[in-house]
């Protein structure tokens, strides 16, 4: 089985919180199952680019359609990882390489990770790496299942997408104009992403992913209640048939 894991961080390369630890362990664990072929896509942050411990080579380059823009992307293949996981860093100097601060917190984070979400799918096509399953994480990768269903279905006809919520408090909100200006999605998907007259990319992922997982069975049950779901309890209830909890580390 071919599995692609997409995340905004992953230890030891770049880590901000618990997601980084999960992405350090999950692909490696999946790769140890006989028959699995696992690839990991991460942004090529400046802190990765300047770390001489990581040996990389450019294996593809293309343009990513982001609204009316076409933004450059280079795929950098990590060549000195010790296990069977193949790591690819997606390089764009403006969005990732030229920034020396924290991974998150820039005013254009919505644009940065909309770019990354679409670039992941474009990279899979460029590398002729069409997976059976795409596993993507939190709001930063929430547009992957949306793009997969709305734009890339012909290129990924048999691929299924699993979306994992690690922290529902951060949902990827944007102004309504973000839909037209940045996303380049068909008009009929406006409602999929709309919430309170704004764009909510996590809502879009819940609606379009084939499977939605959380970090534990307890957390999955808690998300049925407004106190824990931060406004998404109704959306999750409507999609409860595809929601499940998988405890971290299992």
What are these regions (language model features)?
Residues 1-250:
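Catalytic cores of nucleotide-sugar-dependent glycosyltransferases that transfer UDP/GDP/TDP-activated
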């Amino acid at each position: 089985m071919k599995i692609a894991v997409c995340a905004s961080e992953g230890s030891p390369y770049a880590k901000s919180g618990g997601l980084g630890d999960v992405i350090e362990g999950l692909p490696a664990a999946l790769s140890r199952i006989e028959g699995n072929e696992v690839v990991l896509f991460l942004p090529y942050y400046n802190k990765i680019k300047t770390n001489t411990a990581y040996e990389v080579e450019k294996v593809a380059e293309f343009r990513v359609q982001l609204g009316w823009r076409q933004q450059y992307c280079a795929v950098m293949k990590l060549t000195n990882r010790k296990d069977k996981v193949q790591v690819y860093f997606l390089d764009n100097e403006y969005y990732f390489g030229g920034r020396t601060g924290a991974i998150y917190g820039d005013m254009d984070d919505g644009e940065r990770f909309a770019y990354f979400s679409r670039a992941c799918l474009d990279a899979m096509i460029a590398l002729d790496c069409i997976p059976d399953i795409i596993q993507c994480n939190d709001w930063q990768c929430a547009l992957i299942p949306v793009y997969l269903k709305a734009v890339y279905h012909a290129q990924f006809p048999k691929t299924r997408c699993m979306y994992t919520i690690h922290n529902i408090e951060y949902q990827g909100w944007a102004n309504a104009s973000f839909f037209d200006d940045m996303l380049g999605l068909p008009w009929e998907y406006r409602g999929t992403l709309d919430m309170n007259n704004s764009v909510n990319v996590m809502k879009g992922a819940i609606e379009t992913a084939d499977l939605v997982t959380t970090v534990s069975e307890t957390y999955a049950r808690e998300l049925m209640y407004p106190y824990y779901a931060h406004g998404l309890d109704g959306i999750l209830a409507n999609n409860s048939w595809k929601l499940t909890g998988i405890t971290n580390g299992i």
